[in-house]
């Protein structure tokens, strides 16, 4: 239990720091990629024709759902996208914590360094980018997939329900 608390604390502190940082270092103003979003998608956010365009392969489909929720519930708020970015980043960090908790060979100092690098501010560009949160979510899903693969095929043998998750 003590190890679990220690491993979860950097994740929670990282999320809280980023939330604080976003609300103190940015404004709820459309800039950068948000200009493109506002001009091309927001006038008719639920129009499927805006989704099925020639460059559909360069777009992450989950962003459309996020954009619809943002426009319908918040009238389009850039903080919503940035907060989704922080939560998605936190999801990836939580999976790293789960892995470290299961794999006892990851020491406390190593884990803290991994979390420090994972939450480093070099990700700021992706946080204020209107669709960066989907990429962080994809990273977290990739880490989770690796975690489940390791549970199924790793040295510890298969855990209950791990194959179903895979």
Place the predicted regions along the sequence by residue.
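Membrane-interface micro-motifs in multi-pass membrane enzymes
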Residues: 33, 60, 106-153
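Short hydrophobic alpha-helices at membrane interfaces in multi-pass membrane enzymes
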Residues: 147-166
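Juxtamembrane "helix-exit" motif on the non-cytosolic side of transmembrane helices
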Residues: 22-25, 70-73, 119-129
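Start-transfer (signal-anchor) and selected internal transmembrane alpha helices
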Residues: 1-18
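Transmembrane-helix motifs of polytopic, lipid-linked glycan transferases
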Residues: 83-107, 111, 144-148
């Amino acid at each position: 239990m003590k190890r679990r608390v220690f491993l979860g604390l950097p994740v929670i502190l990282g999320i809280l720091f980023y939330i604080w940082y976003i609300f103190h270092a940015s404004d709820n103003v459309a800039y950068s990629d948000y200009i493109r979003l506002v001009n091309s998608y927001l006038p008719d956010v639920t129009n499927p024709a805006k989704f099925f365009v020639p460059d559909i392969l360069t777009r992450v489909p989950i962003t459309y759902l996020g954009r619809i929720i943002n426009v319908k519930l918040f009238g389009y708020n850039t903080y919503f996208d940035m907060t989704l970015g922080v939560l998605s980043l936190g999801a990836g960090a939580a999976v790293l914590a789960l892995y470290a908790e299961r794999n006892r060979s990851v020491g406390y100092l190593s884990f803290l360094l991994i979390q420090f690098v994972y939450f480093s501010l070099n990700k700021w560009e992706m946080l204020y980018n209107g669709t960066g949160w989907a990429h962080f979510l994809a990273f977290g899903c990739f880490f989770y997939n690796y975690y489940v693969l390791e549970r199924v095929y790793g040295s510890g043998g298969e855990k209950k329900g791990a194959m179903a998750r895979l």
